[in-house]
Amino acid sequence: MAAIEISQVCKDYHGGVRAVHHVDIDIRDGEFIVLVGPSGCGKSTLLRMVAGLEDISEGTVKIGDRVVNQTDPADRDIAMVFQNYALYPHMSVRENLEYGLKNRKTAKTEIDARVAEAARMLQLEPYLERKPRALSGGQRQRVAMGRAIVRKPAAFLFDEPLSNLDAKLRVSMRGEIKRLQKRLGTTSIYVTHDQLEAMTLADRLVVLNGGRIEQIGAPLDVYHTPASTFVASFIGSPAMNLLNAELHGDSLAIGPSLFALNGFAPTSGPVTVGMRAEDFRLAAAGEQGFAFRVDYIEELGSQRLIHGMIGDQNLTIAFPPDVDVPAALSITIASEKLHFFSSETGKRIAGKAEQLGVQSAQMATA
């Protein structure tokens, strides 16, 4: 196991195209870090630079106490798990698990012990003599994970390992990866475009956009306090509602609706306001609220996603399945549940609720 330090790392391609811009990440020993973002955000490129499969244009990567910029991939003490399994089709499961260890001239008794341990952990014991073609997709991915585990590396690198699996199998494999990582305590970097996968696996998320870090933090911190409109729209399902609005004194204007903020206005003028679907409720008689026109409803069993409009802007709200929804209704949200972003930069504007939280934390530690 080892800490990994990524310092001011950049990646340039021919023609002056910069794919990764000055990335800094300090990964603690035993931590599970997930790099998440849309296609083309640089997450796989960054992982490949850590692995040594891509050259680093600027900056340094340190694994343990070694700077590994010029170190061959085989000598970096890492193990990778890929989307396409990368198994040898002519070898049995046992032979696939043994292969890397044999190449490193590991003693046979040690190979046998490591293979037996990995097979037991991954429930592969009944399949050790089978060829990959006789296995399901989930079983093949477990073999790929087993091949990484037997190496006992300083770090695991996962490059979208579940992308080829169906939805049900992805859920079970997510749990298996999380359980194994906690059991082994091995530092791990995991790449995915699936924000649900990222939220459920990570100790910390690194949200990437255009080759730059948008935010680093624990999953719930990123969810509840997104640093930008990009993060707000990418993390969470459904995505956070982002509406054009204007702050007038202590009131929020969204189209024709005016909403009192009770001292929570962080600034004045035009802003982008963010609202999570689950934070809305029906407004009581006489209570201030937004006029909401229903367009259509998605029934998900555990909740209803109601899509509609406030003025001329789209909005999605989430209600329990037993709530009756008329075609037009008045909805409300607590002032402290609102998120404010600059309408120019998209960056978060700290509201009074966050400022009060910081002050309370400072007083508690004083």
Swiss-Prot record:
InterPro entries, per the entry: AAA+_ATPase, ABC_transporter-like_ATP-bd, ABC_transporter-like_CS, ABC_transpr_MalK-like, ABC_transpr_MalK/UgpC-like, Mo/tungstate-bd_C_term_dom, NA-bd_OB-fold, P-loop_NTPase
PROSITE patterns: ABC_TRANSPORTER_1, ABC_TRANSPORTER_2, UGPC
Main location: membrane
Chain residues that bind ATP: 37-44
Transmembrane spans: none
Reaction catalysed by this enzyme: sn-glycerol 3-phosphate(out) + ATP + H2O = sn-glycerol 3-phosphate(in) + ADP + phosphate + H(+)
Entry superkingdom: Bacteria
Family from the record: Belongs to the ABC transporter superfamily. sn-glycerol-3-phosphate importer (TC 3.A.1.1.3) family.
Subunit record text: The complex is composed of two ATP-binding proteins (UgpC), two transmembrane proteins (UgpA and UgpE) and a solute-binding protein (UgpB).
Protein name: sn-glycerol-3-phosphate import ATP-binding protein UgpC 1
